[in-house]
UniProtKB/Swiss-Prot annotation:
Its EC number is 3.1.1.96. This is D-aminoacyl-tRNA deacylase. It catalyses: glycyl-tRNA(Ala) + H2O = tRNA(Ala) + glycine + H(+); a D-aminoacyl-tRNA + H2O = a tRNA + a D-alpha-amino acid + H(+). It comes from Streptococcus gordonii (strain Challis / ATCC 35105 / BCRC 15272 / CH1 / DL1 / V288). A Gly-cisPro motif from one monomer fits into the active site of the other monomer to allow specific chiral rejection of L-amino acids. The keyword Hydrolase applies.
Length: 151
């Protein structure tokens, strides 16, 4: 999985010019599922996102997680994170998971997140417009295939 994590003051997703979901302070996630992703990737990503200390404490240090601040998550599916741009000028998306697998894993990912933090979603496969107010900005890229083996 490739996930772009953005710390936001607020964010919303609209579909067909109607607001579908919105959050106040928390995280906006752009979530790309790869063909080799599975339960281990979901667990790792959720654990990292929920506990990642990227919110400021009283001393201004990034020392608090989205869970600590009682924030929310807005999760948006985005297969384009798996774009292959090596050949030509048109990105290829052959490195993205097939829609059936991606949809299932995206749903499972969001269910796991929602067990930890209030989580809202876009609609998988929909044409969405996402608006946000970055906080910082703080933007982190998480790739579940690029992780240390935990002991």
């Amino acid at each position: 999985m490739k996930i772009v994590i953005q710390r936001v003051k607020q964010a919303q997703v609209s579909i067909e010019n109607q607001i579908h979901n919105k959050i106040s302070s928390g995280l906006l996630l752009l979530v790309g599922v790869g063909p080799d992703d599975g339960p281990d990737d979901l667990d790792y990503a959720v654990r990292k996102i929920v506990h990642m200390r990227i919110f400021s404490d009283q001393e201004g240090k990034m020392n608090l997680s989205v869970k600590d601040i009682e924030g929310e998550i807005l999760s948006i599916s985005q297969f384009t994170l798996h774009a292959d741009t090596k050949k030509g000028n048109r990105p290829a998306f052959v490195k993205a998971a097939p829609p059936e697998l991606a949809s299932r894993l995206y749903d499972e990912f969001n269910q796991l997140l929602a067990q930890e933090v209030p989580t809202k979603m876009g609609i998988f496969g929909a044409d969405m417009q996402v608006e946000l107010i970055n906080d910082g900005p703080v933007t982190i890229i998480l790739d579940t295939k690029n992780r240390r083996e935990e002991v």
